[in-house]
Amino acid sequence: MARAAPPALLLPLLGLAAATAAAAAAAAAVGCPSSTWVQFQDSCYIFLQEAIKVESIEDVRNQCTDHGADMVSIHNEEENTFILETLKKQWKGPDDILLGMFFDTDDASFKWFDKSNMTFDKWSDQEDGEDLVDTCAFLHTKTGEWKKGNCEVSSVEGTLCKAAIPYEKKYLSDNHILISALVIASTVILTVLGAVIWFLYKRNLDSGFTTVFSTAPQSPFNDDCVLVVAEENEYAVQFD
């Protein structure tokens, strides 16, 4: 007698297990585009170490936009320190890094190329009344201070780029621990539930086979009865 197929309930369980595994993979994949980027708070940073010849700061900026980013902007002391330490320890950058900043003559103020608000500065050479037309900013990696310089640079020894983590990715990343815990718990529950259902299914199946054998026709004579009858028949033949 062929055994029946596993109960249909196991198929949805397998589907749920596959879905939770896919959710775990998606949660693990969030963050920066690749391992060459470094994440800090809600942004990803990459230092393009190639030295290039340029005619203007726009050529430098294109290096970043080609990677889906923009030239770096800095908004607090913690971010400035992070960039400084990473340049020293990991990126091995030059003494001066061009920041993504320009002087807007329309309202006589410095602005970031990525259009974020100018909420922080660390100027080392702030002077009143200086001519700031075509002025850009550089981060001095030895001190962490900013200094002004001409935007019409002829070459750069590396470009520091920054990209914001999309809202969806940031939300998933912030809740990665919770998601992982839920995935693990769901997987354990599904595994235990599947094992219980499979055990009950096999037990019921084995009980069915036992019932079939127990209801099969039985001979009215057992082996001992057959042996006694045979001996009596043999004894009767000897006296005939």
UniProtKB/Swiss-Prot annotation:
It comes from Sus scrofa. Potential multifunctional C-type lectin receptor that may play roles in endocytosis and phagocytosis as well as in cell adhesion and migration. Its main location: membrane. Disulfide bonds join C136-C151. It is found in: Membrane; Cell projection, Filopodium; Cytoplasm, Cell cortex. Residues 198-240 are cytoplasmic. This is CD302 antigen. GO terms for cellular component: cell cortex; filopodium; membrane.
